[in-house]
Amino acid sequence: MQLRAKVCIPIAAITLAIGIGCYFIIQKQFEQLNDTNIQNLVEARASQMQQAIELCSEQAMRMAALVSRLPEVEAAYKTALAGNIDDENSATSQKGREMLRASLAPMIDGFAAVIGEKPQIHYHLPPARSFARLWRDKQTKKGDKWVDISDDLTSFRPTVLDVNKNGKALSGVEVGSGGFEIRGLAPVTGLAGNQLGSVEVLVSFTHVLDGLNSGAGQTALLYMNAEHLKFATGLQDKDKHPIVAESYVLVRGTKEGK
């Protein structure tokens, strides 16, 4: 009996030790597997987002090209360029802006009737001044008031400067008055081939984030560095776009992460 006890106790101890060792090994493997799955998911979502941005950028640039050489657009630009386009309150720029709104209204309305929202088409005066944001009734906000002016974009819109300088279309993501948007830009030229300005089409990040939110329990949010708020006037409502950690602004999503 004593011999059996002496044999069984060491075997039991060894078995217990092996069991505990196996438990920790298996637990570690599960943790590593979980970490790997999370990493794979993040990388897959990042790749999916990059592909969606590239696709939306290309579509935006193609749409901008469609509205870059219309005769009525050239007429509106010639009206604006006859005055002082560096004056944000220029009467000739305002007249040209109203010409753009009137001549392109049927196209804007037709798009909205089919798609459910107005296309975000933005014409610029050279080198980088807003001419007409065709999805808005007025151009931009100063404080709490909407104003109809040719606001200056030179300090935060390098893509507009680039297109007006080099005359070549481009696309990508850039901060504007509404925050981060996917953009496609094209030069505006007259029938004689002379460059008059530029035009861009904006695509909301909402379309990209909706695709990323398709998985169960998965939520994608978009944040912007708070330093860009001085330009992104459309994100200055702290109830809709709260500041996080004093450094970031919620652009798309909700406070609850939904």
What are these regions (language model features)?
Residues 84-96, 139-149:
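Short, flexible/disordered intra-domain loops and linkers
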Residues 105, 109-202, 210-212:
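Extracytoplasmic/periplasmic ligand-binding sensor regions of membrane-associated signaling proteins
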Residues 52, 56, 96-100, 151, ...:
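Extracytoplasmic/periplasmic, Sec-exported soluble proteins
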Residues 3-94, 113-118, 168-172, 184, ...:
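Juxtamembrane extracytoplasmic/periplasmic/luminal helical "stalk" adjacent to the first N-terminal
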